[in-house]
């Protein structure tokens, strides 16, 4: 094994994607306790290593694939609202009521709609609204119920909405604006989740 040699292998993220057959989309699931996975390499000098076997190429393909599913999400675990439990939330909307998040899908299949799901949280004494845009085009508005300040009620309210978007560019910028007439209101982004289709073309350099 020389100094310029390296090992390539298939690794799995602690964050996983699950297929939802009811809508044909993938939903992400963030690992509650880890952001990385560790692999341990064992070298046995007493035995020959494994080898990749040569396989014959298949003839007369019955199906031609020209695109594939691509998914991406933005979720940061910045704040635990009640300092207890497993629910953490990301960017805060109070002093900064508008924030943008950039996604990139090289060779995006523009004939297939992009599915964008946004989940948000708000703590407001009156109903409040999030406005979600993609590349400056309005996607949807998400209404969030007001909280009730009596004992044993929710500290904040959660809402979610999914919308299809016909993207004309591989770059998708999601902008979220928050509005409430309660001057003491606070809000948070839970996550943005995107399902898209990409053309089966190589992007980047060869290994």
Predicted regions and their residues:
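Structured catalytic cores of large enzymes
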Residues: 1-207
């Amino acid at each position: 094994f020389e100094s310029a040699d390296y090992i390539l292998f298939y690794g799995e993220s602690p964050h996983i994607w699950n297929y939802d057959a009811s809508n044909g989309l993938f939903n992400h699931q963030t690992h509650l306790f880890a952001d990385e996975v560790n692999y341990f390499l064992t070298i046995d000098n007493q035995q020959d290593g494994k080898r990749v076997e040569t396989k014959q190429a298949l003839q007369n393909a019955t199906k031609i694939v020209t695109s594939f599913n691509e998914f991406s999400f933005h979720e940061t675990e910045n704040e635990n609202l009640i300092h207890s439990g497993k629910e953490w939330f990301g960017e805060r909307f109070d002093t900064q009521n508008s924030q943008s998040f950039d996604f990139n899908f090289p060779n995006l299949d523009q004939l297939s709609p992009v599915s964008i799901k946004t989940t948000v949280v708000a703590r407001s004494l009156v109903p409040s609204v999030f406005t979600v845009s993609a590349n400056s085009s309005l996607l949807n508005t998400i209404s969030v119920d007001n909280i009730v300040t009596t004992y044993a009620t929710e500290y904040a309210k959660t809402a979610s909405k999914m919308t299809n978007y016909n993207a004309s560019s591989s770059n998708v910028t999601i902008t979220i604006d928050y509005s409430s007439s309660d001057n003491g209101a606070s809000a948070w982004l839970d996550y943005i989740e995107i399902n898209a289709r990409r053309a089966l073309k190589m992007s980047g350099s060869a290994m």
